[in-house]
Design a protein with these regions (language model features):
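Bacterial Sec-dependent N-terminal signal peptides
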Residues: 1-37
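C-terminal functional modules
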Residues: 38-42, 48-50, 56-60, 67-70, ...
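Acidic Gly/Asp/Thr-rich repetitive segments characteristic of extracellular carbohydrate-active
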Residues: 98-143
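Extracellular beta-strand-rich, repetitive "passenger/adhesive" scaffolds
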Residues: 115, 169-176, 195, 541-544
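Extracellular beta-strand-rich solenoid/capping regions of secreted or surface-exposed proteins
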Residues: 132-139, 151-165, 176-193, 199-216
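Right-handed parallel beta-helix
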Residues: 163, 168, 172, 188-199, ...
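Acidic, divalent-cation-chelating loop motifs in proteins
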Residues: 520-524, 545-553
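Cysteine-centered, disulfide-bonded loop motifs in secreted/extracellular proteins
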Residues: 524-536, 540, 554-562
């Protein structure tokens, strides 16, 4: 690695790559003052950022002014609006799962049950028939798709009104992908399935997540593909509640949250921020997910309380696997699978790290760490850590292991967990690679490449990069932050890191694919195709039947369609022995 004052985008020669990565890991602590510098913007870029943020804030205020009266009206009619929620009990819970197969802290979210059905028919950023129209509306709502393709956002799309379900599995053909800007959740009772969020922008002006926001709670995310974020791919752990103009904002944990069967991969390292996720909250659970080819935060724990991390797969981390929390935090790390990749420094502590609890947020004059229950985790290639996760897999700041802290940290029984079906780590590895991400209506080529990299240990990359900004669009980057070739001067990895899985531009792994599909016939625009309604005795010319429940099982007719249920069969969904992913079992929505 060259001197900090010179260009340090060295080439990753495979012969000495591991030696350099060990050095990188050992120097990680010092990066806070030297290498982890944030990019500096030009004056013009700063002015652009200020102008954009003011415009976005104005737009959000206008959106909320229209939605708020509807939200308040529905609250008076039985759908409470609780923006200050900070405890799991602050939000009411449904009596049946958000959908069959929902598990964990968010499994009893209402989503948009019983609300208006919005059918997305346009890929435009805004206007009639768009995703933005549906998400920015007030009132309970369920969003289905009758179009396929890329929805390229021109500004962040923020969900402010509660009670929303987005059913990405209903898109025809190849499905949809949200690109260009952040998709954010700033409310409660949100259910999202089979959606792709790939921001994909590398301009230094706006370095944000692909999927995140200011989430309040009752969040149920299933089969999400979150990639190409410039900060993190997907983050849910806290929200800031503003009591009023004369009060300071209060930080509160996101409550009742689940992320399951999802992918957080290929965060963009253009400015040293290839980070997977910051997660946490109260009554939170994260299971059967994949974190792949993010340098750090795989994931980071951003809240105290009990952090449930079960049956996940982590691959090709560089300087951070999982870390965070404080002395109040409690961790359940159960039956996860860790696979070091080409850029994982296998000969350093981080190379076999399962979890590094931290104390920095505690603001104490002494070191005190949270408590950890860790069992059944596999560290591929490391028999010692696999046999005993505490033999090097659980680490603390500044030490290779937990020597001197183990007695305080180690728990021998799991902390209280919400309902989660748990499998062995090896079975979880196979399950995640076969099922994670937006697999319906079909898994796209980007996720196929991500999964194949994990299986083979070899990165997919294009052999000939584009001539224009092949390492990312760094227009707006101040001269003092630029290397000789115009890239970010203080980037830790070399320009060819994409050959080993860490990318700085989506084009390095092929860029956005095309998505095609034929719209379904839906005469009454109620989100249920005519053929499906006719088959099950509903009226294809009466939109009101979407919100009815033809068999009394608790799911409305539109929910029966989007979740692959047979309306002729009534099932007791309160009985968790019946709680399985009916949509996956059917292979998608019925045509």
């Amino acid at each position: 690695m060259t001197d900090n004052n010179n260009k340090n985008n060295y080439t990753l020669n495979p012969k000495n790559m591991q030696k350099k990565l060990v050095l990188l890991a050992l120097m990680a602590f010092s990066f806070g003052t030297t290498y982890a510098q944030y990019p500096q913007l030009t004056s013009a870029a700063k002015a652009r950022v200020d102008s954009m943020q003011k415009a976005w804030a104005k737009h959000q205020a206008e959106v909320w002014a229209k939605a708020e009266p509807i939200v308040k009206k529905e609250a008076a009619e039985g759908r409470p609006y609780v923006p200050w929620a900070g405890r799991p009990t602050d939000l009411p819970q449904a009596k049946i799962p958000a959908f069959p197969g929902a598990e964990g802290g968010g499994m009893y979210s209402f989503g948009g049950r019983g609300g208006k059905v919005y059918v997305v028919t346009s890929l435009a950023d805004s206007g009639p028939g768009t995703l933005r129209e549906a998400c920015e509306a007030g009132g309970a709502r369920i969003v289905v798709f009758n179009v396929s393709g890329i929805i390229r956002l021109k500004s962040p799309l923020i969900v402010q009104a509660p009670y929303l379900t987005i059913a990405g599995q209903t898109a025809p053909g190849d499905g949809v992908c949200v690109a260009g800007q952040t998709f954010g959740v700033d409310t409660h009772d949100v259910v999202i399935r089979h959606m792709r969020f790939r921001r994909g922008e590398t301009n230094v002006d706006h370095r944000e997540d692909s999927f995140g926001g200011n989430p309040v709670g009752n969040i149920m995310l299933d089969h999400i593909s979150a990639e190409w974020g410039l900060d993190e791919n997907i983050s849910f752990y806290r929200h800031m509640w503003h009591p009023g103009a004369d009060y300071k904002a209060e930080k509160r944990g996101t409550v009742n949250v689940t992320i399951q069967n999802s992918i957080s991969a290929k965060a963009l390292d253009t400015y040293n921020h290839s980070f997977g996720s910051t997660l946490g909250g109260e009554n939170c659970s994260f299971m059967r997910n994949l974190w792949s080819c993010n340098t750090g935060r795989n994931p980071s724990i951003g809240w105290n309380g009990i952090f449930n991390f079960v049956n996940n797969v982590v691959y090709n981390w560089v300087h951070r696997s999982s870390d965070g929390g404080d002395y109040q935090a409690m961790f359940n790390f159960i039956n996860n699978y860790y696979k070091p990749g080409p850029l994982t420094p296998k000969d350093s502590p981080v190379g076999h790290r399962i979890l590094k609890p931290e104390s920095g947020r505690s603001k104490l004059s002494y070191k005190q760490y949270g408590r950890v229950y860790a069992t059944g985790n596999i560290m591929e290639g490391n028999e010692r850590v696999t046999k005993d996760n505490w033999d090097g897999g659980i680490q603390v700041e500044g030490q290779r292991d937990t020597k001197g802290y183990t007695e305080q940290m180690r728990a021998y029984e799991p902390f209280e967990m919400p309902y989660v079906q748990i499998m062995g780590a090896q079975k979880a590895y196979d399950f995640v690679l076969a099922n994670a991400g937006a697999t319906l209506p079909k898994r796209d080529i980007i996720d196929e490449r991500v999964i194949d990299e994990v299986r083979t240990g070899q990165a997919y990359y294009v052999k000939k990069l584009p001539k224009d900004n092949p390492y990312g669009d760094v227009s707006g980057l101040a001269e003092k932050s630029q290397a000789e070739d115009g890239t970010f001067k203080y980037r830790r990895l070399g320009n060819d890191s994409y050959k080993y899985g860490i990318i700085t531009d989506p084009r390095q792994m092929g860029g956005y694919p095309e998505y095609h599909g034929t719209p379904r016939v839906d005469s009454d625009s109620d989100g249920m195709p005519d053929a499906w309604e006719k088959k099950y005795g509903l009226n294809p010319n009466d939109a009101s039947d979407a919100s009815l429940d033809c068999n009394g099982d608790g799911y409305t007719n539109i929910e029966k369609y989007i979740n692959g249920l047979d309306p002729r069969v009534k099932i007791d969904w309160r009985n968790l022995s019946n709680n399985y992913d009916t949509l996956a079992a059917r292979g998608g929505v019925e045509e």
